Design a protein with these regions (language model features):
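A structural motif shared across PLP-dependent enzymes of the aminotransferase-like
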Residues: 19-20, 45, 95
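Beta-strand->loop->alpha-helix junctions that form or flank phosphate-binding loops
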Residues: 14-16, 38-45, 58-72, 140-142
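C-terminal catalytic lobe of FAD-dependent flavoproteins
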Residues: 75
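Short alpha-helical
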Residues: 25, 45-49, 70, 121-122, ...
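Ribokinase/PfkB-type carbohydrate-kinase core domain
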Residues: 52-66, 78-168
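Glycine-rich phosphate/adenosyl-contacting loop at the front of the ribokinase-like
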Residues: 1-40, 49
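Acidic surface patches and DE-rich sequence motifs
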Residues: 4, 44, 79
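Hydrophobic alpha-helical segments
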Residues: 17-20, 24, 71, 127, ...
Length: 168
């Protein structure tokens, strides 16, 4: 009915489980539009739903690694007016390493597009390395947080902004 507030308990009318995350959703949308897409990231032991969604959409999963821990999760609460509230648990999304980033970016270069979102770690390093390789960097800075202050956002060619983050 409404977005829950602190100290409140509320019944839910339904529970739905989907694969997703901004990065995965963008990769799938581009692949369905006919663009060759390589998705990079780290999934946990619970990542089969994500890998299956990639394969079904034609997304190349060569750069997806699996770790023996829980992956990232998102809980989205939607009220009767379709407004939402989103809570993130980073999990494996926060486990990128410089070595992994370097391994992925080694196969890409000038003119290739890199699409990022602020639900992963190492953004400053990823942006710097991609910029040095003259890649085109597209970024959704959501969730807008202090981590972005470590990034040289002047190296980003295009921003994809959500309503709230656009106001910030």
């Amino acid at each position: 009915d409404h977005i829950i507030v602190g100290g409140e308990t509320q019944h839910s009318s339904k529970l739905e489980v989907f694969s997703g995350g901004k990065g995965l959703n963008q990769s799938i949308a581009l692949a369905k539009a006919g663009v060759p897409v390589y998705h990079a990231g780290i999934v946990g032991t619970d990542g089969d739903i994500l890998l299956d969604a990639c394969k079904e959409a034609g997304v190349n999963t060569k750069y997806i690694r699996r770790l023996p821990v829980k992956g990232g999760h998102t809980m989205i609460q939607v009220d009767k007016n379709a407004q939402n509230c989103i809570i993130l648990y980073g999990g494996t999304n926060q486990m990128q390493t410089k070595e992994f980033v370097d391994e992925v970016l080694a196969d890409f270069g000038e003119g290739d597009y890199l699409i990022l979102q602020n639900e992963i770690n190492m953004l400053d390093y990823i942006i710097d390395q991609a910029y040095e390789k003259k890649m085109k960097i597209v970024m959704n800075p959501s969730p807008f947080d202090d981590k972005l202050s470590t990034c040289d956002l002047s190296k980003v060619h295009l921003f994809l902004l959500n309503e709230i983050e656009g106001e910030q």
